[in-house]
């Protein structure tokens, strides 16, 4: 079904050795374009939701059966062996929406319970292969899928887990290093747990007008990004960068400065101006956010460089748990050039300089292991495992 294959390792310490301290250019007056939107710009969810028709689902089902008949491994799913002749053009256009227009879309209509977990995952990978040709690693052990859930089987106290493995609210952030963030909704929450998106450009424009010193602080490459709990290593990078005419964000409040779990460390704490700038852009993101009412079976794809995301706290049902499956994707043709100061986590996800196993866990493992570092983090960890130690890897063959 979803067996291992190979790709490059996460040699992030080598990737992080030569980063200039200050890459800030002159402040612009404003960032304009289709990515500079406000949640109020969207009258309803039909504006950004692609509702599949019956014939569309039939085409996807036929592609699934065609792929399974080939006897290939799940990791081999791509646009060549998952044929969608009628949907391909619109999926290609949706990839352009992510990179060149509003930056996101929701695909709806695959919520039927007729799919097994394996088939549902294969469909997710197959459709995603039309959006982007590369799937990134999400931890140092090579996991390509991560499960964002709070399993009822886990006994480890919630304060000792990653934030994505809890029911708590997560602040606005990016998944550092990811180009396109994709989420498959396996099951929604009983109450709450909404996903929110917010335009980095719109939030930044507010700072340019009202707090230019905060905008300058975010563009300055002196933010300490912790990359390991063992030895407490970090590199310096900007929270925002203007590169090739695009505003790009690499913000995770839980990775800036020393993490509480690290103990005594030489990693610098955030300065007062950095703390203020982080608070200001977060508040601006809240003011202009868009709430997504995602349904079971939905697929969400968005530009992780251009949009911040967060979620509400939530309550699960007695017998159900909110469950999303995450992919990190890159489109080799449309993907944005990444500034050198933001390369370390990107290189960790997409780099090719050695041999590494790629794993596709289908469900979370019942026995949750306490992470070595960054319990409570909203996004991934670069060196210590975010998913590999707490998810079971199902290695099987497609029937």
What are these model-derived regions, one by one?
Residues 2-94, 100, 105, 112-114, ...:
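Active-site environment of non-heme Fe oxygenases that use a 2-His-1-carboxylate facial triad
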């Amino acid at each position: 079904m979803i067996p291992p294959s190979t790709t490059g390792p996460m040699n992030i310490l080598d990737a992080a050795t030569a980063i200039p301290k200050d890459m800030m250019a002159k402040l612009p007056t404003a960032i304009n374009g289709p990515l500079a939107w406000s949640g109020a710009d969207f009258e309803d969810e039909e504006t950004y939701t692609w509702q599949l028709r019956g014939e569309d689902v039939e085409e996807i089902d036929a592609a699934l059966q065609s792929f399974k008949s080939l006897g290939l491994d799940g990791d081999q799913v791509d646009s060549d062996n998952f044929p969608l002749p009628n949907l391909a053009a619109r999926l290609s256009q949706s990839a352009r929406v992510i990179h060149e227009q509003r930056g996101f879309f929701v695909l709806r209509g695959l919520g039927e319970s007729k799919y097994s977990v394996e088939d549902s995952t294969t469909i997710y990978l197959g459709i995603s292969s039309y959006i982007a040709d590369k799937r990134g690693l999400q931890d140092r052990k090579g996991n390509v899928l991560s499960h964002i859930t709070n399993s009822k089987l886990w006994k480890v106290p919630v304060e000792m887990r990653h934030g994505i493995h809890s029911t708590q609210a997560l602040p606005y952030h990016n998944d550092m290093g990811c180009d396109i963030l994709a989420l498959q909704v396996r099951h929604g929450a009983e109450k709450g747990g909404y996903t929110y998106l917010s335009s980095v450009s719109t939030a930044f424009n507010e700072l340019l007008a009202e707090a230019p010193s905060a905008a300058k602080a975010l563009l300055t490459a002196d933010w300490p990004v912790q990359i390991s709990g063992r030895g407490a290593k970090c590199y310096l990078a900007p929270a925002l960068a203007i590169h090739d005419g695009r505003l790009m964000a690499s913000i995770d409040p839980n990775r800036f400065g020393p993490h509480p779990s690290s103990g005594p460390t030489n990693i610098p704490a955030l300065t007062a101006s950095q703390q203020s700038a982080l608070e200001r852009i977060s508040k601006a993101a809240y003011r202009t956010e868009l709430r997504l009412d995602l349904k079971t079976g939905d697929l969400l794809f968005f530009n992780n460089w251009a949009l911040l995301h967060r979620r509400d706290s939530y309550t699960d049902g007695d017998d159900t748990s909110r469950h999303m499956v995450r992919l990190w994707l890159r489109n080799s043709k449309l993907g944005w050039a990444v500034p050198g100061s933001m390369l370390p986590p990107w290189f960790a996800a997409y780099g090719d300089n050695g041999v590494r196993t790629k794993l596709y866990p289908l469900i979370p493992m019942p026995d949750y292991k306490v992470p070595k570092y960054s319990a409570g983090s909203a996004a991934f960890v670069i060196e210590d495992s975010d998913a590999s130690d707490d998810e079971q890897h199902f290695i099987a063959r497609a029937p």
